[in-house]
Amino acid sequence: MLTLHINGEQKQFPPDLNVAQLVATMSLAGKRFAVELNGEIVPRSGHATTPLRDGDQLEVVVAVGGG
């Protein structure tokens, strides 16, 4: 199993996961969001090619409109 820290919570995932696969599990389809991996923003174009490793720290931020 792969242990990731997402928005401060420790979670378990199957091995060989990339950012795009992780995002797909988070019900973010159609939403505007940003992913930070170990302190670095991962561009959307790199989600499918950015592998996740045991112990990685992620912050996933969803943009919320309002006024």
Where are these regions (language model features)?
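Ubiquitin-like/PB1-type beta-grasp interaction modules and other compact soluble beta-rich domains
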Residues: 1-66
